[in-house]
Amino acid sequence: MKRLLLSFLFTVAFGSCAFEVGEDELCFVGDSITYLWDLEYYFPNYITHKHAVSGAGLKQLDSWDVSDCKGRTTILLIGTNDIGYWKSTADGIERLREDYKDRFIKSAKRIGGKPMLIVSILPRNEWGKQDSLVNENIRAQNGVLRRSLKDIPDWEFVDVFDLFLDKGLQIREDLFKDGLHPND
């Protein structure tokens, strides 16, 4: 599944001219999902910079030195560790979504990637123990991000959320090894 996701990103990036002609370096920033990507395999003709740590969220990202991403095409996939346990029925959920969106934009701007491809937060069912309310919330948070990022120059929100779903808001079990990390 990682191949499908990365191929999709590559197609979107080139289809929307996100990669500059002659560009030879790409930056990837994220959590364990990004950490597990074999960038040398998927992008053999590029020098890649990877800033990704298992369990990372925005708080951790804000402490990383990502200065090598400034001005470079950057792919950002982070968020499941920040909001992956929220339920859409939680008290104050709208305030939480707006606060997360503001922190997300601030963190992404600090990276300084140009252009910036922001990948939607993926659905999940970690070890088969989460209910679909978690994915309902992730879908809603992706919507907040999509609407908020659309007018930021040189940023593209790449929504792959539905590609990972089966019926309803259940994940496609065949695409995840543990309900969280996409298969190879």
Regions found by a protein language model. Name each.
Residues 7, 16-74:
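Serine-esterase "nucleophile elbow" of acetyl-processing enzymes
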Residues 42-47, 62-184:
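Alpha-helical cap/lid subdomain in secreted, periplasmic
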Residues 11-12:
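Repetitive helical segments and hydrophobic/amphipathic motifs
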